[in-house]
Amino acid sequence: MARWATMSTETTGTGARDEGPRPGDPADSPFVRACRRKPGPHTPVWFMRQAGRSLPEYRKIRASVAMLESCRRPELITEITLQPVRRHGVDAAILFSDIVVPVAAAGVALDIVPGTGPVVNDPVTTAADVDRIRPISREDVPYVDEAVRMLVGELGATPLIGFAGAPFTLASYLIEGGPSRNHTKTKALMYGDPDLWHALASRLAEVTLAFLKVQIDAGVSAVQLFDSWAGALSEADYRRYVQPHSQAVLAGLADAGVPRIHFGVGTGELLAAMGEAGADVVGVDWRTPLDVATRRVGSERAVQGNLDPCLLFAPWPVIEAEVRRVLAQGRAAPGHIFNLGHGVLPETDPDVLTRVVALIHELTARPNARS
């Protein structure tokens, strides 16, 4: 596969795409075509957390570099992002970063602790804490801008996905001080001081939007908004406290010319509301069949998902049967991007992922489907 032809500088850093895609343009790739509900030569596949601890080459690079530091070094971001594309032949790369990178750039003191995740030094409890979260621009995250431009040149026709954390999930980290099982402090603030909650979520929406615009201006072909913890909410609470802020982010990208993917874990009952927030593609975890998800999000949106990450530890005949099932259910959607229902687990055998990619490409080959 010719994945490494360098693109001309005329195709990088253009922001909104006004011209139609040309042959070899990532905008005409199977991934972007599926996002736009257009036919393509096969069902595209990539994996959340495909650049990560399942790869020995990733573990080697990260052995002596802290997580947050690795997210601030363009040469490391570039190499780590490329690793799964080289190894697996996936249809899209996703920028290596972490959802707390933009809030750190906005002045929040935090670290990413091995085995724990993001830990915030001074959790948000007051309006003064919210006021200390400053706006960001390209100058605050130059390493992201540089890495995206490098990657677009390296990837050629393979699209690069940019990403950011959604306001609710970021707010939960900032309020709880780190990962939380029940999000008790987050919900207490949300219910008890809704004005403060909306002020925080609105500020984080501004930071997230700015972070995604940096990536789009540098040349990413799509973006994904991760709302990892949204499944902790009822639909009523989601619509009241969360949807307006995710909608602000996605609406701010409406004229950017790239597909917008919206994903959360445990959000089967929220899929319609997440789609209504402004997504072109709604990510689905493994709990909800894709044909059911398609009915919930409607015919105006593609779906992404949704193999259970744990199934990759099963015998190959079981994996193959489940891949076939997901593909069959995905045919109910106007566009389907194959993915896992959450991130690749660290213990996953990378050879199994490579085999899954090859199987999907073989089973869905449609050489004359492009139109």
From Swiss-Prot:
It catalyses: uroporphyrinogen III + 4 H(+) = coproporphyrinogen III + 4 CO2. The record marks D98 as: Transition state stabilizer. GO terms for molecular function: uroporphyrinogen decarboxylase activity. Its EC number is 4.1.1.37. It is an enzyme of class 4 (lyase). It comes from the Bacteria. Residues 1-30 are annotated as: Disordered. Substrate binds at R49, Q50, A51, G52, R53, D98, Y173, S228, H342. One of its GO terms (cellular component) is cytosol. Residues 1-14 have a biased composition (Polar residues). Pathway: Porphyrin-containing compound metabolism; protoporphyrin-IX biosynthesis; coproporphyrinogen-III from 5-aminolevulinate: step 4/4. It is found in: Cytoplasm. One of its GO terms (biological process) is protoporphyrinogen IX biosynthetic process. InterPro entries: UROD/MetE-like_sf (IPR038071), Uroporphyrinogen_deCO2ase_HemE (IPR006361), Uroporphyrinogen_deCOase (IPR000257). Keywords: Cytoplasm, Decarboxylase, Lyase, Porphyrin biosynthesis. Its main location: cytoplasm. HAMAP family: URO_D. Catalyzes the decarboxylation of four acetate groups of uroporphyrinogen-III to yield coproporphyrinogen-III. Homodimer. This is Uroporphyrinogen decarboxylase. The lineage of its organism: Bacteria, Bacillati, Actinomycetota, Actinomycetes, Micromonosporales. The gene is hemE.
